[in-house]
From Swiss-Prot:
Belongs to the OST4 family. It is a single-pass type III membrane protein. It is found in: Endoplasmic reticulum membrane. Subunit of the oligosaccharyl transferase (OST) complex that catalyzes the initial transfer of a defined glycan (Glc(3)Man(9)GlcNAc(2) in eukaryotes) from the lipid carrier dolichol-pyrophosphate to an asparagine residue within an Asn-X-Ser/Thr consensus motif in nascent polypeptide chains, the first step in protein N-glycosylation. N-glycosylation occurs cotranslationally and the complex associates with the Sec61 complex at the channel-forming translocon complex that mediates protein translocation across the endoplasmic reticulum (ER). All subunits are required for a maximal enzyme activity. SUPFAM superfamilies: Oligosaccharyltransferase subunit ost4p. GO terms for cellular component: oligosaccharyltransferase complex. Disulfide bonds: none annotated. Coiled coil: none annotated. The chain crosses the membrane at residues 5-25. This is Dolichyl-diphosphooligosaccharide--protein glycosyltransferase subunit 4. Residues 26-40 are cytoplasmic. Residues 1-4 are lumenal. It comes from Drosophila virilis.
Length: 40
């Protein structure tokens, strides 16, 4: 069975991964938006 400590570690790792995924998405989206405006 999963202990409380294992569940806490898993949820923290998952939260950090999702946060970094959102930050990377916004970073990529902002850069592609600026470059597409400059080329038009």
């Amino acid at each position: 069975m999963i202990t409380d400590v294992q569940l806490a570690i898993f949820s923290n790792v998952l939260g950090v991964f999702l946060f970094l995924l959102v930050v990377a998405y916004h970073y990529i989206n902002a850069n592609t938006g600026k470059s597409s405006i400059k080329t038009k």
